[in-house]
């Protein structure tokens, strides 16, 4: 058991967690019984939406690798645990910027997608999910 927090640092909950190291790994679902599974990024949600009190957290922070970046088109493929701050370090020197940025750069890509975050330009650019392609 490990303690996980949301950004508000309340509630503090000890949770069973499984760290994901490879995006193609299969989760040991048979070990979880009837408990629910919830992916966990960097814990920057204001509420407790990133906590799973009676379930299992799937810690995606180790999934922090880039898959591909095309500096011509600006298209980036990466894993769920990559922080927006790391993306900015990669894309800004190439003349790109994220179309939507929430109030903190310490959000993971997976968290930004799961919560469909928005920035101050929401009325023009929409949410993070508007710029995600499969």
Give the ranges of each region predicted by the language model:
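N-terminal regions that are enriched for targeting/export leaders
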Residues: 1-9
């Amino acid at each position: 058991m490990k303690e996980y927090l949301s950004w508000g640092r309340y509630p503090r909950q000890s949770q069973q967690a499984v760290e994901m190291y490879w995006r193609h790994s299969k989760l040991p679902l048979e070990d979880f019984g009837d408990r629910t599974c919830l992916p966990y990024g960097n814990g920057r949600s204001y509420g407790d939406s990133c906590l799973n009190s009676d379930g299992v957290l799937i810690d995606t922070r180790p999934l922090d690798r880039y898959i591909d970046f095309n500096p011509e088109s600006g298209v980036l493929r990466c894993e769920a645990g990559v922080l927006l701050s790391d993306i900015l370090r990669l894309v800004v020197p190439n003349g790109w910027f994220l179309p939507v940025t929430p109030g903190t750069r310490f959000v993971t890509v997976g968290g930004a997608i799961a919560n469909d975050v928005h920035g101050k330009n929401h009325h023009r650019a929409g949410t993070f999910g508007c710029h995600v392609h499969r």
